[in-house]
């Protein structure tokens, strides 16, 4: 329970806190828990024992800095030292040894693996324990089942069949009598009957033969093994059989873990100690008792809701890293055992460190983690498109991944919003497409209880004691606790304590919405944004938008590109500052002092007599090819305080998030250029660099050794290439810094040696070999060339040389991209569109004061989409622009009074009209609209038009990366049709529906060309080029295209032969021809 002393007001927690807390738990507890499980390695023949101790382990500071790890493609990790003991005969050695490196989380909440920023997503899984459900079969008979889920995700089912016999289904195929299972777990029949509530039901179904099978534990284990492993014949009881059963069944299906034990005790009213984390016979019997009670009506039909958050748990970064550490220690154990055997063969005296030092052993830890980060679906490349994306990525929760659901098989119920999500998982923010509802985002106040894995939400406790003290206590409720509280919603969301609460308020109780007296309320919400994620909380007037459009908006804000000159929004929600702060893109002063000097690379600060150098990020490439850049914001000689902003990051202004630009928009049709979500823009946005962004692309090349053993060479001396293409290379063959490069230019010159074959020798070469014995070698040119669409300025070149023959060269090229036709823009209300035309500013519609409009949106995009928030935003933005004001508006302002949003907008427009003495800003006949003029003719438009200042973002979906054309290129090997996709230089596919469209117009010859010459007719497509160049007639071939041949071959594989026959008109002779 948390309490704030002053007024009980709660502050928003740090958005990256969840990742940091998880990693700290792994370092402080997870490492110790796994080291405690490490067994003592003994070799009885030679009286040797090796042991690791959980206490006193140490992590050294990383040997390299973050920047260098990224620069040199290394892993940012820390060396782990553990206390070890080696008993060798009578000699006991204790030593602190290094067992490898562990990746370390940086200040962004991410890891650097091989130079790439990666982040671990929280996974939401079904909690281990037991779950009951009852359903009717096709005959209307009730079927009750209980499912036991282990900590590893293994499932076992208890069920009662039509003959009222109780079975345990340990896998999909095998089912085993509950008596056999209990006996195999160590209970005899007398113990079973003494520990159940319905012994007569247990006695009713076993016959004499079955009773014989459970006479002893050994017989029960044999019976269980035969049925579980589907083995026939006479088996003999042995220790190896027990071990196999232990490994295959009991470890996978019966380990409940700490969380599972708590859930099992709570569900079945047991009092088994928490440290007993395995399934016991007592659990099985209690679970069967409950099932019998459900089936025969003596119990309550209380089905478990599998989608309720109380039945889910979060696997955070701590759990996943701890699992990998346990896996690495298991591998270390095997490696040490091998080393011990090797030591005795060589007859050398071992020490604890020499057992772990061999190269393969010492890198086990880091290779395990690198494999995990490279292959695990929830360890993702960190999304660095903009500061919002960096903040949001670590707060994602996903039902996907190992042990979870899949996009193709998940049901609608598992994707749906559940009442228990309130204040924990955002009801809006999820992905679109196949994974809708399976990936979500944590609400801004939610926190994870790392011990039990539940998501908690804060509330104000309304108790008599708190009312007397005039204090508010903040309580964090887990999903299973808030069912017992009356939680006030609606008007009680107000932040102002002076507002008198109504007598009757809407409330939530046990997943139902009620209206009850204020005196009966237990807790209330603490913040209007409490239910939303960061993305949803940045949408002003979200309550006026349809939820589908709010979802699109929260996704599209994460795709916004940082612009060259950022601008903060006129209308916001107030959460922009904390989002920018927690993204760590700005530089914050860690101590007070005085600025000595500042430039684009560093800031020098004098504090307590010391000079501190603070490095800045200058034009660094992000994972999404956007430009990360920090600009100093403090002049020389200025005194600064702790926490003050020293340098702004990309897409931040004054410490606030600034993803887009405030531009003048009009909602009106214009010559069809804004049909179907197209957007018409003014050329001012291009010429004044309003939507100009910088992008950095990385190109790399590596030298290797050929199969003949000769090394590749980086050089400027490349024969057969024009001098023009090599103009930017320095004497080493690498492009110069600051060069302007165009498509096709050589960035790094490289030659690969090739030994010429005997047949390719020319006469002179043969003579040289005969006289001097010289081998003639030819070199193939394998240089790094700039691909299509890559033109720009070289801003950085990295030469990484690990050994003389292994050289990697990376070239970074900066591109300046203005907005152009085909780029995608969007507002913060899901109103997205593609630029269709860029008009000269004199042709754009203009206002009554002569200001030309910047963007023209289609008004038909508003009513059907029901995202009316954009109308409020644009009108209030216009008022704010004229009054030089910024607004920060909390959602659901209708809780104060009806039509609060509309009243606010109209009052501000009226104030702006009065102060600027412009009556057109607020016209009472059509408030918010204005008569505007056609820029081409000067005539006013017939209808008044809605105008305003909207905050519009430029998205990362840009035409430069999408547009593609092909004349010739690669073909698929089987069908001989052009390959698919821009990356492969692919062609356009004319599919079935496109063929129908052409058939509808009767264009037979065009269709013939498309399906043969331009596609997969091998001979015809070679001849058509010749015919086109020389102006000859295109030949008409009778043989079929390649795809038809593929069809014939596929029919042959089904034993169907396809032939055609030519029948003579004269004598009706049949000439058979093969297809």
From Swiss-Prot:
The keyword Chloroplast applies. Keywords: Chloroplast, DNA-directed RNA polymerase, Nucleotidyltransferase, Plastid, Transcription, Transferase. GO terms for cellular component: chloroplast; DNA-directed RNA polymerase complex; mitochondrion. Its main location: plastid. The keyword NAD does not apply. One of its GO terms (molecular function) is DNA binding. One of its GO terms (biological process) is DNA-templated transcription. It catalyses: RNA(n) + a ribonucleoside 5'-triphosphate = RNA(n+1) + diphosphate. It is found in: Plastid, Chloroplast. Coiled coil: none annotated. Its EC number is 2.7.7.6. PANTHER family: DNA-DIRECTED RNA POLYMERASE I SUBUNIT 2. Belongs to the RNA polymerase beta chain family. In plastids the minimal PEP RNA polymerase catalytic core is composed of four subunits: alpha, beta, beta', and beta''. When a (nuclear-encoded) sigma factor is associated with the core the holoenzyme is formed, which can initiate transcription. DNA-dependent RNA polymerase catalyzes the transcription of DNA into RNA using the four ribonucleoside triphosphates as substrates. This is DNA-directed RNA polymerase subunit beta. The gene is rpoB.
């Amino acid at each position: 329970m948390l309490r704030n002393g002053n007024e009980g007001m709660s502050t928003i927690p740090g958005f990256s806190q969840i990742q940091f807390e998880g990693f700290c738990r792994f370092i402080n507890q997870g490492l110790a828990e796994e080291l405690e499980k490490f067994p003592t390695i003994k070799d009885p023949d030679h009286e040797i024992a090796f042991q690791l101790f959980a206490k006193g382990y140490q992590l050294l500071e990383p040997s390299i800095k973050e920047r260098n790890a990224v620069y040199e493609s290394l892993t940012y990790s820390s060396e782990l030292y553990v206390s070890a003991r080696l008993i060798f005969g009578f000699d006991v050695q204790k030593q602190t040894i290094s067992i490898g490196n562990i990746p370390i989380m940086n200040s962004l909440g991410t890891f650097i693996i091989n130079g790439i920023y990666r982040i671990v997503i929280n996974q939401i899984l079904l909690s281990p324990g037991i779950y009951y459900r009852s359903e009717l079969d096709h005959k209307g008979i009730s079927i009750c089942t209980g499912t036991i889920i282990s900590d590893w995700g293994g499932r076992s089912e208890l069920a009662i069949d039509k003959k009222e016999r109780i079975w345990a289904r340990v896998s999909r195929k095998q089912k085993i009598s509950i008596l056999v299972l209990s006996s195999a777990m160590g209970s005899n029949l007398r113990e079973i009957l003494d520990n159940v509530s319905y012994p007569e039901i247990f006695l009713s179904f076993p016959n004499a033969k079955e009773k014989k099978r459970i006479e002893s534990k050994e017989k029960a284990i044999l019976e269980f093994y035969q049925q579980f492993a589907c083995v026939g014949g006479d088996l003999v009881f042995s220790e190896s059989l027990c071990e196999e059963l232990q490994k295959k069944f009991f470890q996978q299906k019966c380990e409940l873990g700490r969380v599972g034990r708590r859930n099992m005790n709570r569900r079945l009213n047991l009092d088994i100690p928490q440290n007993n984390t395995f399934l016991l016979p007592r659990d099985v019997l209690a679970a069967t008792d409950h099932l019998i009670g459900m089936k025969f009506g003596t119990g309550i039909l209380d089905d478990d809701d599998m989608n309720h958050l109380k039945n889910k748990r979060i696997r955070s970064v701590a759990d996943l890293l701890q699992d990998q550490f346990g896996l690495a220690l298991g591998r270390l154990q095997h490696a040490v055992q091998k080393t011990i055997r090797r030591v005795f063969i060589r007859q050398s005296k071992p020490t604890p460190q020499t057992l772990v030092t061999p190269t393969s052993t010492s890198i086990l830890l880091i290779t395990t983690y690198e494999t995990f980060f490279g292959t695990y679906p929830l360890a993702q490349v960190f999304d660095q498109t903009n500061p919002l994306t960096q903040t949001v990525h670590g707060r994602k929760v996903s039902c996907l991944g190992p042990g979870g659901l899949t996009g193709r098989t998940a049901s609608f119920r598992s994707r749906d919003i559940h009442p228990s999500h309130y204040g924990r998982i955002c009801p809006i923010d999820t992905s679109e497409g196949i994974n809708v509802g399976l990936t979500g985002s944590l609400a801004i106040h939610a926190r994870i209880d790392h011990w039990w894995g539940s998501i908690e939400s804060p509330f104000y406790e309304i108790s008599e004691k708190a009312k007397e003290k005039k204090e508010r206590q903040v309580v964090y409720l887990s999903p299973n606790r808030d069912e017992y509280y009356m939680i006030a919603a609606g008007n009680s969301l107000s932040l102002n304590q002076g507002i008198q609460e109504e007598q009757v308020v809407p409330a939530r109780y046990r997943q139902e919405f009620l209206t009850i007296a204020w005196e009966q309320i237990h807790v209330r919400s603490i913040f209007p944004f409490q239910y939303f994620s960061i993305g949803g909380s940045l949408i002003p007037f979200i309550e006026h938008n349809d939820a589908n459009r709010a979802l699109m908006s929260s996704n599209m804000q994460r795709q916004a590109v940082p612009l060259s000159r950022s601008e903060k929004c006129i209308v916001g929600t107030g959460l922009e500052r904390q989002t920018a702060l927690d993204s760590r893109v700005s530089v914050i002063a860690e101590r007070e002092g005085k600025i000595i000097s500042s430039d684009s690379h560093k800031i020098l600060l004098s504090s307590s007599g010391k000079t501190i150098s603070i490095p800045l990020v200058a034009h660094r490439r992000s994972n999404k090819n956007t430009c990360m850049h920090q600009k100093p914001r403090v002049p020389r000689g200025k005194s600064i305080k702790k926490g003050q902003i020293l340098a702004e990051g990309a897409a931040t202004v004054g410490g606030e998030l600034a993803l887009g630009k405030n531009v003048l928009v009009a909602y009106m049709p214009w010559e069809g250029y804004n049909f179907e979500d197209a957007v018409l823009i003014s050329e001012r946005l291009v010429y004044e660099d309003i939507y100009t962004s910088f992008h950095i692309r990385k190109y790399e090349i590596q030298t290797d050794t050929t199969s003949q053993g000769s090394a590749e060479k980086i050089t400027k001396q490349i024969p057969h290439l024009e001098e023009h293409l090599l103009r930017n290379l320095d004497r080493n063959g690498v492009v110069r810094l600051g060069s302007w490069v165009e498509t096709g230019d050589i960035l790094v010159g490289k030659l690969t040696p090739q030994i010429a074959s005997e047949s390719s020798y020319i006469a002179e070469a043969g003579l040289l070999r005969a006289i001097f014995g010289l081998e003639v070698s030819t070199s193939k040119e394998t240089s790094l060339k700039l691909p299509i669409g890559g033109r720009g300025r070289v801003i950085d070149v990295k030469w990484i040389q690990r050994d003389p023959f292994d050289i990697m060269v990376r070239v970074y090229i900066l591109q300046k991209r203005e907005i152009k036709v085909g780029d995608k823009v969007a507002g913060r209300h899901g109103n997205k569109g593609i630029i269709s035309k860029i008009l000269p500013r004199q042709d754009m519609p203009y206002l009554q004061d002569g200001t030309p409009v910047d963007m023209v949106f289609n008004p038909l995009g508003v009513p059907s989409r029901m995202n009316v928030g954009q109308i409020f935003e644009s009108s209030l933005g216009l008022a704010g622009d004229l009054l030089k004001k910024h607004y920060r508006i909390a959602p659901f302002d209708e809780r104060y009074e009806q039509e609060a949003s509309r009243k606010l907008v109209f009052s501000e427009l009226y104030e702006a009209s009065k102060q600027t003495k412009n009556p057109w800003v607020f016209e009472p006949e059509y408030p918010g609209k204005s008569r505007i003029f056609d820029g081409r003719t000067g005539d006013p438009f017939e209808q008044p038009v809605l105008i305003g200042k909207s905050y519009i973002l430029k998205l990362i979906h840009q035409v430069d990366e999408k547009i593609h054309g092909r004349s010739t290129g690669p073909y698929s090997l089987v069908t001989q049709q052009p390959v698919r996709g821009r990356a492969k230089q692919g062609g356009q596919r004319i599919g079935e529906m496109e063929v129908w469209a052409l058939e509808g117009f009767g264009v037979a010859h065009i269709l013939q060309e498309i399906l043969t010459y331009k596609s997969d007719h091998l001979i015809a497509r070679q001849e058509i080029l010749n015919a086109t160049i020389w102006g000859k007639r295109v030949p008409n071939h009778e043989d079929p295209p390649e795809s038809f041949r593929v069809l014939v071959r596929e029919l042959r594989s089904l034993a169907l032969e396809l032939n055609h026959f030519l029948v003579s008109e004269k004598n009706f002779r049949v000439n058979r021809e093969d297809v």
